[in-house]
Amino acid sequence: MATTFTNRSSLSYGGNTVISNTVTGEIAEVLGVTKTAVTDEYRPGEPVTYIVTLTNSGSTELSALTLTDNLGAYTFNGTTLVPLTYDESSVKYFINGDLVAAPTVAGTSPLTITGLTVPAGGNTAIVYTATPNDFAPPAEDGTITNTVEITGTGLTDVTATETVATEDAPELRISKGLCPTSVTENGTIEYTFIIENFGNTAATDAVLTDTFNPRLTNIVATLNGTALTAGTDYTYDAATGLFTTVAGKITVPAATYTQNATTGAYTTVPGSTTLVVTGAI
């Protein structure tokens, strides 16, 4: 990208002043930068890989360049929050496609990498990962936009931005409980399954399968306190102990997220569904 400049002069003589014509020129920038995330989506706690590519259209090597990445910094209630945490020692450095020794990481928030070089007519790529933290928006339609700036003596500063969006999907976890843990022969036991959704989207297609051992008889199943009907809501093979819910019967609501007004950190309350199966052994 070129920067245009204009200039004109004045000439004074005998109490008079005349103005020259205006001349126009341009300064062609030789340094270019792009920034790309390997994936378009993020999930809190999972690293995002970024590639920053520098190009040199000039005939002279560019050296002693500095990269600064704001890691998605944004303002919340008057405070600057940084939703990405640079992953230590993750930097990879390529010059004209060849992997070379990693440059110096002079700071991590903002991420500052010094001593970069771009050969004449060539390119340099800096690859690193950063992990969304407690300040990264987790809800549907959340985004992180971060800006990288390249600076160097005698050069016009150049910038590039990249935006990644939340991965809108359920994230299920399940725990199983038994009560009582000690029971007499022909006694009754109760299995409790708690299914939690830490994702930002409801789960509508969960299927729970369990082979009860010892096998149960006369089973009763409830979902969130509502009785389930054998054959319609679940199947059970008394000969093998195999219990399976019908697809679509179990739904788990999305998690809810709250951003602390003071710290700006998000907290997660998972959506939850409880399945209880009771039977005799």
Residue spans for each PLM region:
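Exported/extracytosolic protein signature
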Residues: 1-281
